[in-house]
Amino acid sequence: MGDEMLKERLKKVPLQPGVYLFKNQEGQVLYVGKARVLRQRMRSYFQAPERMHPKVKAMMAWVSDFDFIVTHSEMEALILENNLIKSYKPRYNIDLRDDKSYPYIKVTVADKFPRVYLAREKKDGVSRYFGPYTDVTSLRDTLKLLNGVFGLRSCRTMKSRRRPCLNRDMGKCLSPCSGEISEEEYSQKVQALITFLEGDFQEIVREKEKEMAMAARSLEFEKAARLRDQIQSLRQLGEKQKIELASPYELDLVGMLSGEKENLVLVFKVRSGKIVGKDTFWLKRPIQEDENEAMEFFIKHYYDENPDIPPEILLSHLPSESKLVEAWLKSRVSHRVELRVPQRGEKKQVLNMLLENARLLLEEKQREENKQLAALSHLARVLDLEVVPNRLECFDVSHLAGEETVASMVVFVGGQPEKKAYRHFKIRTQQNNDTASLAETVRRRLENARQANPAFLPEPDLILVDGGLGQVNAVAAVLQEMNLDIPLFALAEKNEEIYRPGKSQPLVLAARDNGLQLLQRLRDEAHRFAIEYNRKRRAKKIRSSALDEIPGIGKQRKKNLLVHFTSVAKIKEASLDEIAAVPGMNRKAALAVIEFFHNQD
């Protein structure tokens, strides 16, 4: 995806907190980051190269796609960022993020008189853990506040204590060590604290607000200010952490929303209570298929390809045959699998967050589709076409000084790339003649369609070639020879002029014209695809011409050498012993390699 296309997509990114993922052409995650405002933060990566940090500039050279997950708060985004970095281990996050774990609030509920304190890890299965939290300093202050509000003990042990500590005199401890509070009363305080940490903090906030108002009326301004600060801290701590669930659940969340032409399915993978991955799927919806049937199809398809099946799968809609699907899932793993729609609690809240992300994606796609349909309609008017084109194809040629000449064919349907329809061509005739190469490519493409080759069907509604008048006339001759009446145009890169067959005067559209921008996207994608294939061909030729000529070095040995040394140049620099140590090699074969490169030099 070109830089301009990414910038266009960036305009649709919401102004909300969340996490973004930059990816390369293969879909590998290169970088995970968080933002208080997603669009603003992501936009900073697309500024002028000279203004970028060298590391950022190096990363962006590989970025060809991005994804994002919207969260309810920046705190959630921080935690999700941490989880995703640990999960994906992106190349460009290694030096930019540490691998520390965020702290938790631990309540030792198994103790007779539980205490609450900060913990870095979940070390036992009996205590209650809340968090994690990202601001350690604020968390320590809040812990002091909680101990003051609820009066729980802060001492490590009560065994050696014979009299109350200073906290009791300051009103910050209920002093269970001195017997001033019963186990039952203390337990009620612990439960109140747990209820607060679970998110039900409005009641205590209301009580504090009443106290603050009374203090203000009594002119106790210092007390009122202290209560105001406590309320702010309580609200900050009370912000629910939906990105990490309270228990170490192993589950998937699957949410489905219906668009006009297809269903969008979003999958969040939760492992050890953390969201560690996101998958997005678009399902073309058959006529009269309801959401339950669509969900059944997706579950079967997704988990047939994915062996990582957790014991619990939470859904926005149950499959039409949920019990049958559960039995099928169980047959694929060694444990029971439950499918259900959560009705309340934190699981319901996380599913709602997933569906909010799905809604944003669906709305973005619908806006983009409407925009592209408008661009196609406009293009039909300015190019004087009889019908609005749906399938657009663009052809481009790439070579280096006439070496390894190749051509590309890219396809846009409805204004969007149809990558499964992309094709490469190795030029068979004139290697150093772009015009002749374009004519050959279009001829071969159309001949394949005429022979009913399914890989080249249907025929295009419009053909675009990279070039000017010479290129468009050469391809027009092919269409005339084949008796085909397909609208044909060329787009010249220098001045972005549109050429038509037999007309020397180009059509010039405004730079912001949405029809021109669509043709530019199509042309740039064909250019990228052609260059990529040419580079692969030249790299393959370099590797094969060197190693395939060495006696005793077959396909497997060549592969082992390239895997071990990563390049032919490094093989040439290696010693006899280093080459002989490669799996599958021996001293005789290593000597043949050494002698071959020695004779070459």
Swiss-Prot record:
Domain UVR span(s) in chain numbering: 202-237
An example Gene Ontology molecular-function term: DNA binding
Limits of the GIY-YIG domain: 15-94
Keywords associated with the record: Cytoplasm, DNA damage, DNA excision, DNA repair, Excision nuclease, SOS response
Record-level GO BP terms: nucleotide-excision repair; SOS response
One Pfam family of this chain: HHH_5
PROSITE patterns, per database record: GIY_YIG, UVR, UVRC
Subcellular compartments: Cytoplasm
Subunit structure: Interacts with UvrB in an incision complex.
UniProt function note: The UvrABC repair system catalyzes the recognition and processing of DNA lesions. UvrC both incises the 5' and 3' sides of the lesion. The N-terminal half is responsible for the 3' incision and the C-terminal half is responsible for the 5' incision.
Similarity field: Belongs to the UvrC family.
Name of the protein described by the UniProt record: UvrABC system protein C
